[in-house]
């Protein structure tokens, strides 16, 4: 789909006169080139630049006016909401209809914000594409020059966070008829009869504002301090992750080892924040019956360095807390035990700052209700804090001091920073056993707005990206970072609409001018990140329309032996290769998969040279039980054969005693083989190795030994008689 066609289909009718005149600019570019026999002059360049300036002024002015209008409308509705709420305790309280009118007005404002964000995004894409086309066709490089003009009129950089928070508060009041739910945001966390599930998703920057607006219609933005006006800095979260030079914690978390820990120091807000949280995250496998846990305690910033060095003791950390007596003694003792363990690990493993993560978080949750909690982290950035290359970035401090929360941290070298291209959505559900999540949540996580990325970790991504020369294994999502996660929108019940009508004009997936219909079709069928574990069930292969006819894909060995058999020069060599092929088939498996005809596989995603992709593997408890049952079954065969041997040895004739030797040897061989196979399987399962667990030798070996034992016993008796 050409961008001009996409623009004409996606434009909002009310804003149609204010869009970039992309087709006119494209026509001007092509006509001037054709009139000058493909030559581009400085005069033509000046004229084209003036046309771009006119379009930029038009778009920027409209965005500025519309943005001011939205803020004015929000302010007016805020006054109406406050007035309506004050009347609740009067003699003439407002009716339900009054709140419904306010809710409709806010829904209309939400639609305006959505349309304005879409308008800005589409026009910015238009400018980028026409400049790219200009540079490609004329040979003049306009992009860096015009980028300065775009930055001077940044209609595409409007931040809607403050607006989203304000609208969320007002919408929550209107939706609850002036009685918004209040309570502890952490309530409900200790109830037991719940199924807790956490899933993570990537969100393309084009979809961030729309996603926020959709969520706030169902959950309010969680504001921790309602007594102060929201500021941009309030949403900032910074974490310093610790590890040693061997990256032991990184590899433990990457492999999801049982008991793998992550240690970090975290603070909320700007650099003036005095309270630092010392946190430890511990991974637990499902088979242990325990849940992964995060534990933390607070520490004053001035004591952090001494605590990490062991100079500031645990008793000193909690001396004031003990003296005040505001918390139960058992809780204080638990915190002291946690602090002691963290300090011990820090010193023993020689942990030091390695990676910093920074992001602005928007949290959505009903206060006092932990059933659905959603957080959206934007401007995610990872920064190096280590000294592994000989550069002491922290200067023996617990964090580097040359940056704060001034994203995008332009003062840093490119080798020290990784600006993550997507936002990270985290959905935490807590439902009754057997209960489905809310319908709107299911639609949201299944929509085109998000891309599932199971087990995504900021710490793992930061280390794998910034310390690429030190790591051998990388997370499964890293080779896919260049894959476009945008997908064509599908109709849902959660899309942003104006009250009283439906708006299905959205089609937010942008294609380059050179893109053709084949690419669009490929995107329609694309499963996104092909290594996502949950998605692999449904998207094992990217397939064309399938039929019932299956075709066979043979292994390399099978194909080799088939060629040898066909090209055999004499019957003896042919028979030889047939026998070898038979044993290869028996010991190495069929290695033949029946797949629908027309299926194709995506083989473009590969690990970088010298790296291995670590895919998280979940080992169910039943795997261990099945291994033990198999071991006990073989053990019972060994015991049975041993019992036969012992019986013949004890109660049989002298000839039978000699015949029992065969059964004894068979019993011993089965026992040794069983123990070896069991030990090998347990180790492979514990290490989550992708190996063949089938025992191809055992059954045949037992059968052969048993036959030989019977024949030997029969022969002994035959000779004796």
UniProtKB/Swiss-Prot annotation:
<dbReference type="Pfam" id="PF02656">
    <property type="entry name" value="DUF202"/>
</dbReference>
<feature type="site" description="Important for inositol polyphosphate binding">
    <location>
        <position position="22"/>
    </location>
</feature>
<keyword id="KW-0256">Endoplasmic reticulum</keyword>
<keyword id="KW-1133">Transmembrane helix</keyword>
<dbReference type="InterPro" id="IPR042267">
    <property type="entry name" value="VTC_sf"/>
</dbReference>
<dbReference type="GO" id="GO:0033254">
    <property type="term" value="C:vacuolar transporter chaperone complex"/>
</dbReference>
<dbReference type="GO" id="GO:0000329">
    <property type="term" value="C:fungal-type vacuole membrane"/>
</dbReference>
<dbReference type="GO" id="GO:0016237">
    <property type="term" value="P:microautophagy"/>
</dbReference>
<dbReference type="GO" id="GO:0000421">
    <property type="term" value="C:autophagosome membrane"/>
</dbReference>
<dbReference type="GO" id="GO:0005783">
    <property type="term" value="C:endoplasmic reticulum"/>
</dbReference>
<feature type="site" description="Important for inositol polyphosphate binding">
    <location>
        <position position="26"/>
    </location>
</feature>
<feature type="binding site">
    <location>
        <position position="264"/>
    </location>
    <ligand>
        <name>ATP</name>
    </ligand>
</feature>
<dbReference type="GO" id="GO:0005789">
    <property type="term" value="C:endoplasmic reticulum membrane"/>
</dbReference>
<dbReference type="InterPro" id="IPR003807">
    <property type="entry name" value="DUF202"/>
</dbReference>
<feature type="domain" description="SPX">
    <location>
        <begin position="1"/>
        <end position="148"/>
    </location>
</feature>
<feature type="binding site">
    <location>
        <position position="361"/>
    </location>
    <ligand>
        <name>ATP</name>
    </ligand>
</feature>
<dbReference type="GO" id="GO:0007034">
    <property type="term" value="P:vacuolar transport"/>
</dbReference>
<dbReference type="GO" id="GO:0006797">
    <property type="term" value="P:polyphosphate metabolic process"/>
</dbReference>
<dbReference type="GO" id="GO:0008976">
    <property type="term" value="F:polyphosphate kinase activity"/>
</dbReference>
<comment type="function">
    <text>Catalytic subunit of the vacuolar transporter chaperone (VTC) complex. The VTC complex acts as a vacuolar polyphosphate polymerase that catalyzes the synthesis of inorganic polyphosphate (polyP) via transfer of phosphate from ATP to a growing polyP chain, releasing ADP. VTC exposes its catalytic domain VTC4 to the cytosol, where the growing polyP chain winds through a tunnel-shaped pocket, integrating cytoplasmic polymer synthesis with polyP membrane translocation.</text>
</comment>
<keyword id="KW-0963">Cytoplasm</keyword>
<keyword id="KW-0926">Vacuole</keyword>
<dbReference type="GO" id="GO:0071944">
    <property type="term" value="C:cell periphery"/>
</dbReference>
<feature type="transmembrane region" description="Helical">
    <location>
        <begin position="631"/>
        <end position="651"/>
    </location>
</feature>
<feature type="binding site">
    <location>
        <position position="266"/>
    </location>
    <ligand>
        <name>ATP</name>
    </ligand>
</feature>
<feature type="region of interest" description="Disordered">
    <location>
        <begin position="489"/>
        <end position="512"/>
    </location>
</feature>
<dbReference type="GO" id="GO:0005516">
    <property type="term" value="F:calmodulin binding"/>
</dbReference>
<feature type="binding site">
    <location>
        <position position="359"/>
    </location>
    <ligand>
        <name>ATP</name>
    </ligand>
</feature>
<feature type="binding site">
    <location>
        <position position="200"/>
    </location>
    <ligand>
        <name>ATP</name>
    </ligand>
</feature>
<dbReference type="InterPro" id="IPR018966">
    <property type="entry name" value="VTC_domain"/>
</dbReference>
<comment type="subunit">
    <text>The VTC core complex is an integral membrane heterooligomer composed of the catalytic subunit VTC4 and the accessory subunits VTC1, VTC2 and VTC3. The complex exists in 2 different sub-complexes: VTC1-VTC2-VCT4 and VCT1-VTC3-VTC4. The VCT1-VTC3-VTC4 subcomplex is mostly found on the vacuolar membrane. The VTC1-VTC2-VCT4 subcomplex is observed in the cell periphery, probably ER and nuclear envelope, but localizes to the vacuole under phosphate starvation. Each subunit contains 3 transmembrane helices. VTC1 is a small membrane protein without hydrophilic domain.</text>
</comment>
<dbReference type="GO" id="GO:0005938">
    <property type="term" value="C:cell cortex"/>
</dbReference>
<feature type="binding site">
    <location>
        <position position="426"/>
    </location>
    <ligand>
        <name>Mn(2+)</name>
    </ligand>
</feature>
<dbReference type="InterPro" id="IPR051572">
    <property type="entry name" value="VTC_Complex_Subunit"/>
</dbReference>
<feature type="topological domain" description="Cytoplasmic">
    <location>
        <begin position="673"/>
        <end position="699"/>
    </location>
</feature>
<keyword id="KW-0472">Membrane</keyword>
<dbReference type="GO" id="GO:0061736">
    <property type="term" value="P:engulfment of target by autophagosome"/>
</dbReference>
<dbReference type="Pfam" id="PF09359">
    <property type="entry name" value="VTC"/>
</dbReference>
<dbReference type="GO" id="GO:0000822">
    <property type="term" value="F:inositol hexakisphosphate binding"/>
</dbReference>
<keyword id="KW-0832">Ubl conjugation</keyword>
<comment type="similarity">
    <text>Belongs to the VTC4 family.</text>
</comment>
<keyword id="KW-0808">Transferase</keyword>
């Amino acid at each position: 789909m050409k961008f001009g066609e996409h623009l004409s289909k996606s434009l909002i009718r009310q804003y149609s006169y204010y869009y970039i005149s992309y087709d006119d600019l494209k026509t001007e570019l092509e006509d001037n080139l054709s009139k000058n026999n493909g030559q581009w002059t400085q005069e033509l360049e000046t004229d084209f630049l003036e046309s771009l300036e006119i379009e930029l002024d038009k778009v920027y002015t409209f965005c500025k006016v519309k943005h001011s209008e939205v803020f004015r409308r929000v302010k007016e509705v805020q006054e109406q909401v406050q007035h309506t709420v004050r009347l609740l305790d009067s003699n003439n309280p407002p009716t339900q209809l009054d709140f419904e009118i306010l809710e409709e007005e806010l829904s209309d404002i939400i639609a305006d914000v959505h349309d304005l964000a879409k308008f800005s995004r589409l026009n910015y894409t238009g400018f980028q594409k026409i400049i790219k086309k200009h540079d490609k066709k004329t040979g003049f490089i306009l992009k860096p020059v015009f980028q300065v003009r775009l930055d001077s009129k940044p209609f595409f950089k409007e931040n809607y966070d403050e607006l989203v928070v304000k609208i969320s508060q007002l919408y929550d009041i209107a939706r609850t008829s002036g009685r918004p739910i209040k309570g502890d945001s952490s309530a409900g966390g200790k109830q037991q009869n719940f199924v807790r599930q956490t899933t993570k998703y990537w969100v393309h920057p084009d979809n961030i504002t729309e996603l926020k607006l959709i969520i706030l219609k169902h959950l309010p933005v969680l504001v921790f301090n309602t007594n102060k006006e929201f500021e941009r800095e309030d949403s900032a979260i910074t974490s310093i992750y610790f590890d040693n030079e061997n990256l032991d914690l990184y590899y433990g978390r990457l492999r999801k080892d049982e008991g793998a820990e992550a240690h970090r120091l975290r603070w909320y807000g700007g650099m003036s924040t005095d309270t630092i949280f010392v946190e430890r995250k511990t991974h637990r496998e499902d088979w242990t019956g325990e849940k992964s846990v995060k534990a933390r305690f607070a520490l004053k910033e001035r004591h952090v360095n001494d605590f990490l060095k062991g100079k500031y003791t645990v008793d000193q950390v909690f001396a004031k807390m003990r003296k005040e007596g505001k918390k139960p003694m058992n809780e204080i003792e638990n915190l002291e035990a946690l602090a002691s363990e963290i300090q011990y690990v820090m010193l023993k493993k020689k942990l030091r700052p390695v990676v910093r993560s920074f992001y602005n978080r928007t949290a959505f949750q009903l206060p006092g209700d932990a059933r659905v909690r959603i957080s959206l982290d934007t401007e995610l950035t990872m920064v190096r804090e280590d000294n592994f290359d000989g550069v002491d970035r922290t200067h023996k401090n617990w964090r580097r001091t040359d940056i704060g929360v001034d994203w995008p941290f332009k003062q840093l070298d490119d080798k020290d920073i990784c600006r993550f291209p997507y936002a990270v959505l985290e959905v935490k559900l807590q439902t009754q056993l057997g209960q489905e999540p809310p319908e709107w949540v299911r639609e949201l996580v299944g929509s085109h707005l998000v891309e599932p990325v199971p087990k995504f970790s900021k710490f793992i991504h930061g280390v794998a990206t910034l310390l690429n020369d030190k790591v051998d294994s990388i997370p499964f999502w890293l080779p896919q970072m260049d894959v476009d996660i945008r997908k064509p929108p599908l109709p849902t019940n959660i899309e942003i609409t104006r009250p009283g009508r439906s708006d299905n004009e959205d089609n937010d997936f942008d294609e380059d001018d050179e893109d053709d219909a084949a690419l669009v079709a490929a995107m329609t069928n694309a499963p996104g990140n092909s290594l996502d574990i949950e998605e692999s069930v449904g998207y094992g292969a990217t397939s064309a329309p399938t039929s019932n006819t299956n075709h066979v894909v043979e292994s390399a060995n099978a194909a080799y032996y088939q060629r040898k058999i066909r090209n055999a020069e004499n019957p003896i060599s042919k028979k030889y290769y047939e026998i070898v092929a038979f044993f290869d088939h028996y010991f190495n498996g069929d290695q033949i998969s029946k797949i629908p005809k027309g299926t194709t596989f995506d083989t473009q995603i590969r690990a970088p040279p010298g790296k291995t992709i670590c895919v998280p593997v979940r080992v169910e408890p039943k795997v261990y039980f099945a291994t033990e049952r198999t071991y006990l079954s073989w053990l019972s065969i060994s015991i049975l054969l041993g019992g036969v041997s012992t019986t013949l040895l004890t109660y049989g004739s002298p000839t039978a005693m000699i015949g029992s030797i065969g059964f004894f040897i068979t019993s011993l061989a089965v026992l040794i083989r069983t123990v070896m196979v069991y030990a090998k399987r347990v180790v492979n399962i514990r290490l989550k190795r992708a190996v063949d667990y089938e025992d191809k030798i055992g059954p045949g070996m037992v059968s052969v030994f048993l036959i030989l034992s019977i024949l030997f016993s029969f022969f002994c008796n035959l000779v004796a008689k």
